[in-house]
A protein has these predicted regions:
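Short hydrophobic alpha-helical runs that function as membrane-insertion/retention elements
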Residues: 62-67
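Alpha-helical scaffold segments in soluble metabolic enzymes
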Residues: 29, 33, 55, 77, ...
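Solvent-exposed alpha-helices and their adjacent loops that cap or buttress functional pockets
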Residues: 4, 33-35, 55-58, 145-148
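Phosphate-centric recognition/catalysis
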Residues: 178
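Phosphate- and divalent-cation-binding pockets in alpha/beta enzyme and binding domains
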Residues: 51-52, 73
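Conserved, well-structured functional cores that handle cations and Mg-NTP chemistry
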Residues: 1-43, 48-51
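Short, surface-exposed basic-aromatic patches at helix termini and helix-loop junctions that form
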Residues: 53-61, 83
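An anionic, glycine-rich sequence signature occurring as long contiguous blocks
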Residues: 68-172
């Protein structure tokens, strides 16, 4: 497992994941090796654990973490909340939105990132996630050679003062690294 800086295009640290272990146990070890203060740490859903999130914030950094079904009720609550608000174009809660449209190599992709920090209900319902400040949904539509696909991805963040544009850039930077 490695820590990659999208800004510097450089690997800052690496730890070996034991055959009898997984990334969840390696992530805290890797974080201990790094000075992450004032950074935004992005991870896929494997790293979306409340203890890892707390460790990042305790190190004076922030996170943008992919959220999937491995988080059970926490995921389900956020998914229902975001999908319901997306249906209403987030008209009933404070939010920011980032919209991008890209077309290259015969592919057209539209990505809308909706971010809200109006989540006090979530913090009360899931107190173990004490560092969470916002939730986001990425709503993507892709057309390739006339075939259209649609995808939604969920994210949580400790940033309470950033816009959807910032979160969208963090997510895109993460996927740029994943696709290297």
């Amino acid at each position: 497992m490695s820590a990659w800086s999208a800004k510097n295009n450089l690997c800052f640290g690496q730890v070996k994941v034991s055959e009898k272990s997984n990334e969840i146990t390696a992530i805290p070890l890797l974080l201990d090796l790094l000075d992450i203060e004032d950074s935004t740490i992005t991870m896929d859903a494997m790293g979306c654990q409340f203890a890892i999130a707390d460790k990042i914030v305790e190190s004076k950094a922030n996170y943008v973490l992919a959220l999937k079904g491995n988080q059970g009720e926490f995921h389900d609550d956020i998914k229902l909340f975001l999908e319901t608000n997306l249906t209403n174009k987030f008209s009933k809660i404070a939010h920011t939105v980032s919209k991008t449209l890209n077309g290259e190599h015969g592919r057209i992709e539209q990505r809308n990132v909706w971010l809200t920090n109006d989540i006090q209900w979530l913090i009360e319902r899931h107190p173990r996630w004490k560092s969470i400040k916002g939730v986001a949904i990425v709503d993507s539509t892709r057309e390739v050679q006339g075939k259209v696909s649609h995808e939604q991805r969920l994210y949580i963040t400790s940033h309470g003062d950033k816009s959807a544009d910032f979160i969208a850039r963090a997510i895109r930077s993460h996927w740029f690294v994943e696709n290297k």
